[in-house]
Amino acid sequence: MSELNLIWAEDLNGWIGKDNTIPWHVSADMKHFKTKTTGHPIIMGRKTFASLGNKPLPKRENIVLTSQNIDAEGVKVVHSLAALKEYLKANPNEYFVTGGATIYQQLLPIATKLTRTVINKQIVGDTKMPTIDYDRWHLVNHNNYEKDDQLICRFEEWELNV
């Protein structure tokens, strides 16, 4: 059975993006993302893949869920949610969903874990994380990252209630 872990960073108001980019640079969050996802397959949408320069992230199987035809070396393209579910069933692993908002919305109902970073900033964004009913989840781990006695971000790990 595959584990499906949604991983993202959001600001204090739930914004996750602006103009198809991450609207902040927090090196601690980037390191956290790399540590969590390296060695695991990642799933993303076409726009998120394009934001990476149409190049796969190294040391991870990169899966792009899109209805469009894209030709990218080193990437598995899946054209439907049904096809992705079949792939997950046939290839058990811990998968990390890396965005964007539409992909999070589509995969949230089958997710088993959430890895959220809350950036201690308020930005003006154009993309929010889909609404999550946290009553269905329980917090299993959290820690704050501070620099010069200032809270920079909070890392959280959630698991689905069973």
Predicted segments, located by residue:
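Enzymes that bind and transform nitrogen-containing heteroaromatic metabolites
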Residues: 2-162
